[in-house]
Amino acid sequence: MIWILYNVLFFFGFLLMLPKFLLRMRRRGGYARNFTQRFGRYSPDLVRKLDEGRRIWVHAVSVGEVFVALKLMKDWRAIRPDLLFVLTTNTSTAHAIAEKQLDARDVLLYFPLDLPQIVHRVLDTLDPLALILVELELW
């Protein structure tokens, strides 16, 4: 029951906040270009790239965590060069930093919205061997 209530409240809360998000995206520019990733919608090229290897999903919430995640991924790649890393972030600033420093073999995405249909779609698409949460934020 609580899970259903959470999902209903999250959905309507998101709809209520959507105008604010859209205004922010318009002001910042470029932020909207990957907005569909929040819904688990990825370009065909990106989906093809995901088929290139065994995937480890690394989630870094913001800038500080991105630096930790990039170091972790680099060190792990030295041991397991066959792995493909999928790095997700929550903020546009963290995304921009990761974009500049991420290994070309890896994939950078925005973290999906916390709704069951979206999370299932992302898990089906990414099909990760493991998920590494650099820092977990539970609200």
Each model region followed by its residue ranges:
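Active-site and donor-binding regions of nucleotide-sugar-utilizing enzymes
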Residues: 18-139
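Short hydrophobic helices that act as membrane-entry/anchoring signals
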Residues: 2-25
